[in-house]
Every structure is written in structure tokens, then in C-alpha cells.
Amino acid sequence: MEALKRKIEEEGVVLSDQVLKVDSFLNHQIDPLLMQRIGDEFASRFAKDGITKIVTIESSGIAPAVMTGLKLGVPVVFARKHKSLTLTDNLLTASVYSFTKQTESQIAVSGTHLSDQDHVLIIDDFLANGQAAHGLVSIVKQAGASIAGIGIVIEKSFQPGRDELVKLGYRVESLARIQSLEEGKVSFVQEVHS
């Protein structure tokens, strides 16, 4: 997605050869117009897949997931990383390690919001080692729901997350695929479209 790549080039900050900071438009301050375009793009890519729910993880996955849900006309469920007094019944849980925060979290979704009748699109802001995606896959499977695919806003293709998910048979659609963050510069994977 060219608009997203331009935004990354203009506003993204390479903190190391492993970490890209995009807090000016995605995971702290949010650019609503860009999120709308991201939602439109995911909706276009999954329009014929019979999606009934979108599942994401708080907090940075929520904006692109909501915009996609708006376009597809389906509800969005987000996994919580923190305990809540209201989230107690029929919990679907998974452990997720955050590459950026270097911490492990227990994520949870109320089972009342997912069922074996759902066909789910998983959306997240980043894909690095795939831990968040694997956690969300686990939660969706616990509900007995099926998975249409995984939509990623920014993929770090030099890390193993995508390959692992594809090997497991999941369709992964990433809007910006980063090949490298070496020498303080963002290099994108050159995609060949037929």
C-alpha cells in the first residue's frame, strides 16, 4: 500500500535494525484518514471471504481493525492484555510475548463474542516474530471459529513471523513489508504483482 509506505518513509523512525517507531500515525497518535485507507484496503483484500468478525489485540490493532470492520460491516473483538473486572466469564486466553516491550502478557477475549459460526479476520499493527498473531489464532480456535486470514499493517519480513504463519496454512496479507531497517533506513520488500 503506497500511501502507508510513504507515511513510514516520512514519519517512521528507525530506532535499531530491529525496531521501527511509528507512533506519529499508528500506535500512539493515530492518523484517521490513513486508518480509513488501511481499513478499505483490508476490506478489499478480504471482501469475498465471508468474514463475520474481526479479532485484534489492544491497543494498536484496534484502529485498523475498526476501520476494516466498518467497511465490511462486521463487529470487531479485541483481546485485552490486562485483567478487567467485567471480563470474567467464559474466557478464551493465550500467552503472548511482545518483541517491542520484551514482556509476556496473558491476552483474553470473552467467549460470548466468538462462536464456531464465525469466520474471522485477524488484524494487527505489526508482524515480527508472530507471537501476537499466534495468540489470536489460539483464541479463535478455542472458540471453534474458522480463520479467513491475517491482515498486518506493517510486517518486518526479516523476522520469522510471516513464514511461520504461512507454513501453518494461514493467508497473510501485509500492507507494508519491510525487508530491512539496517543503517537507519527503511527498505521495503519489492512485491511482484501478476
Curated annotation (Swiss-Prot):
Protein name, as recorded: Xanthine phosphoribosyltransferase
Family membership: Belongs to the purine/pyrimidine phosphoribosyltransferase family. Xpt subfamily.
Source organism (scientific name): Bacillus subtilis (strain 168)
Enzyme kind, highest EC tier: transferase
GO molecular function: xanthine phosphoribosyltransferase activity
Induction remark: Repressed during growth on purines as a nitrogen source.
Biological process annotations from GO: purine ribonucleoside salvage; xanthine metabolic process; XMP salvage
Subcellular location: Cytoplasm
Remarks, miscellaneous: Highly specific for xanthine, with a strong discrimination against hypoxanthine and guanine as substrates.
One Pfam family hit: Pribosyltran
Gene3D superfamilies, per the entry: 3.40.50.2020
Biological or metabolic pathway of the protein: Purine metabolism; XMP biosynthesis via salvage pathway; XMP from xanthine: step 1/1
Subunit structure: Homodimer.
Any single GO CC term annotated in Swiss-Prot or TrEMBL for this entry: cytoplasm
Superkingdom of source: Bacteria
Catalytic activity, as annotated: XMP + diphosphate = xanthine + 5-phospho-alpha-D-ribose 1-diphosphate
pH dependence as annotated: Optimum pH is 6-9.
Coiled coil regions in record: none
InterPro entries (alphabetical): PRibTrfase_dom, PRTase-like, Pur/Pyrimidine_PRTase, Xanthine_PRibTrfase
Alphabetical list of PANTHER family matching this protein: HYPOXANTHINE/GUANINE PHOSPHORIBOSYLTRANSFERASE (PTHR43864), XANTHINE PHOSPHORIBOSYLTRANSFERASE (PTHR43864:SF1)
Keywords from the UniProt entry: Cytoplasm, Glycosyltransferase, Purine salvage, Transferase
Binding, xanthine: L20, N27, K156
